[in-house]
Amino acid sequence: DINLFRMRKRIMILCTFCAIAIFSSAQEKFSIRGIANEELNNQLLYLCLMGDGEKAKEVVLDSTTVEKGKFSFSGVHQMPDIAIIKDMDGETYPLIFEKGEISVNIAANKRGGTPLNDSLNIALNRMQLIMDNMLKTSDSIYKLMTGMKSEEFADKMVNDTAFRARYDKIEKKFLAQMDSVSHCIKDYKNSIVGVYLFSVGGMMMPFDDMKILMKEASPMFSQNNLVRNIVEKKNQAELRMKAELKNKMTPEQREEQKKRQEMDAKIKIGERLPDAKVKDNAGNM
């Protein structure tokens, strides 16, 4: 029937038009104006999407040439979203697609001009300070252990109280700095800014803290593919580490670990259900 065919065709065209309209409505214009180092004059810069964090999966949206220390990008994209500007040497400079004119200073590694990019700049400065301090602390640990074999280190930790005190002090400082990374990420758990911070420092978080963060964070954070991939990587790393430790354990150590896990489970039940009665190993309440 010709009329039925025409009706189906019109419906199909209408559905296609609606789909395009819906997709287009999620897209908004962005404008980026930037300053670059003199060394980048006449060189290409690439505007990329981070994707899931894997370099091989970065999506190149556009490219431009630096002229007299300046460059620009413009277009339409779903917002907000994380993007990076990448030079020909592979150096990257993060920003967030957002309404308004985004300013980027590659020479100073700064971005701003819009609320989310201003926030990202503040957060990255904070994270960079923590990372710089961690680098200094890890360098102190390296210097303390340089030329030392594992057997010698183990012996010093048991028998050399001065060495043990120095090591414990540095380790405590390093763990506090790792905790600062976690706090920095948690402060942005309801923003796409936190997604980028998590991509930089998420693997430093203890896995238990990471699981709590995923429960507390907004869907913008917890359901982001970049975040979920990092959580899965951390989970796999934890499983590998536990398997390696278990393989190295003596039967006595395994039995002790089992008892400890059972005790931890009873404590957790007691915390959740204060009136609950838990059987002991003899079966008594």
Q: Which role does the model predict for each range below?
A:
Residues 173-184, 209-220:
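Amphipathic alpha-helices of TPR/Sel1-like and other helical repeat/solenoid scaffolds
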Residues 189-200:
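Amphipathic alpha-helical repeat scaffolds of TPR domains
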Residues 284-285:
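Short active-site neighborhood of thiol/selenol oxidoreductases, capturing the structured segment around
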Residues 1-34:
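Bacterial Sec-dependent N-terminal signal peptides
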Residues 26-182:
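A non-transmembrane, solvent-exposed segment enriched in polar/low-complexity residues
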